[in-house]
Amino acid sequence: MSHFFLDVNRFLEAGQNVVIARIIFQTGSAPRSTGTGCIILEDGTIIGTVGGGALEYEVQQKALSVFKKKSSQLVNFQLTGKEVAQTDMLCGGIVDVFLEPITATNIATKEIFARVKTALDNNDKATLVTRVAEGIGHDQSTARMLVVDDGASV
């Protein structure tokens, strides 16, 4: 099984844009926990999961919109009420998902994910910090930062 960020780097190296969908808040019964994420490609292909079923379908549809708008989106999902009862979902919680466009044309972003790959390949300790906000453009170089164990940052 490949590492999530290695997959992102691989797609960027191939010139493919992706949307990272990550659960940033979860309360009650939900299919996955905070921090869980998946990668959505422009054709709708999903690598990984944020929970499957109706939730994953909605995340996929929102991601396709993020590709068009080229800016981040915060989405709140209420896994409660009649709508959920009419599906096969067994959960009854609340989930917030951050959808982040990652484009292969953003040189700073490509450098960060290449450095993440290097850190993983070398078993270096590193922390990837992502700014979470609605409307962050795909070309903003301040959307994320990588801090490696030696104190250097990218």
Specify the residue positions occupied by each region the protein language model found.
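Segments forming oxygen-rich coordination pockets for charged ligands
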Residues: 1-154
